[in-house]
């Protein structure tokens, strides 16, 4: 896996602090799976 591909994937999964504060850990599962 190239570094650029990893970064673009990471950016797609990125969750803002505000979103996490509002939704809690469940938003991680929605975004990642």
Curated annotation (Swiss-Prot):
Family matches, as PROSITE patterns: ACTINS_2
Keyword Nucleotide-binding: yes
Pfam families: Actin (PF00022)
Keywords: ATP-binding, Cytoplasm, Cytoskeleton, Hydrolase, Nucleotide-binding
Family classification: Belongs to the actin family.
Biological role stated in the UniProt entry: Actins are highly conserved proteins that are involved in various types of cell motility and are ubiquitously expressed in all eukaryotic cells.
Protein name: Actin
């Amino acid at each position: 896996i190239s570094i650029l591909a990893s970064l673009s994937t990471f950016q797609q999964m990125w969750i803002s602090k505000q979103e996490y504060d509002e939704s809690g850990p469940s938003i991680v599962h929605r975004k990642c799976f």
